[in-house]
A protein has these predicted regions:
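MIDAS-like acidic motif and immediate structural context at the N-terminus
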Residues: 1-9, 13
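Arginine/glycine-rich "motif VI" loop of SF2 helicases in the C-terminal RecA-like domain
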Residues: 17-21, 70-71, 98-104
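Amphipathic alpha-helical interface segments within eukaryotic helical scaffold
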Residues: 19-25, 31
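Structural beta-sheet core signal
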Residues: 26-28, 77-79, 108-110
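Short glycine-enriched loops at secondary-structure junctions
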Residues: 29-34, 113-115
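Von Willebrand factor
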Residues: 34, 42-78, 85-90, 117-120
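Von Willebrand factor type A / integrin I
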Residues: 90-173
Length: 173
């Protein structure tokens, strides 16, 4: 279940949205996409306004996120997903490749919780790794440091490794 990840993502998104130096968007998805960006000033609204059902269409969510990207070189996209794609997996991988090649810094969190890495789609994580996109589980206490590293354009795979977070990319390297 992604429930803990949704809660932490809502809290961290609200905190990031309160920082004047960054522009924060929050998009949640199952088989539909909901943009909660306008609600980020009220974390309670975000948390209780998030009703996700079953199913996952990552490709649809990425398609929507592409419409939000104005400055790819200054964009960090954090995808929180187990990478099990219920939509068009081939198109999802192509879309992610286009997003990354445009200069967007993409980070895939398999979970944002204290529970460690859940079951996840290893094939998609490996495909992301081939695009230099790390996939790993991150604990809430390390998330602020992760975002600091991303903002500073540090190598996220190396950062994850130094934190003891095993990334799919680190395993392949």
């Amino acid at each position: 279940s992604m429930a803990a990840s949704v809660v932490y993502a809502g809290v961290f998104s609200a905190v990031l949205a309160s920082l004047p130096a960054v522009s924060t968007k929050m998009v949640v998805f199952d088989t539909a996409v909901v943009d909660l960006s306008e609600k980020l000033a009220d974390p309670v609204e975000v948390l209780f306004g998030t009703q996700l059902g079953g199913g996952t269409d990552i490709n649809l969510a990425l398609s929507y996120c592409q419409t939000l990207i104005r400055q790819p070189q200054e964009t960090i996209l954090v995808l929180i997903s187990d990478l099990f794609e219920g939509g068009n997996a081939e198109e999802m991988l192509k879309r992610m490749a286009r997003i990354a090649s445009a200069g967007v810094q993409v980070i895939t969190l398999l979970a944002l919780s204290d529970d460690g890495a859940p079951g996840f789609d290893h094939h998609h994580a490996a495909a992301f790794a081939a695009l230099d996109i790390s996939s790993f589980a991150c604990t809430p206490d390390l998330f602020p440091d992760l975002m600091a590293a991303a903002i500073q354009r540090q190598n996220i795979s190396q950062w994850a490794s130094t934190q003891g977070l095993t990334s799919e990319r680190a395993r392949k390297a």
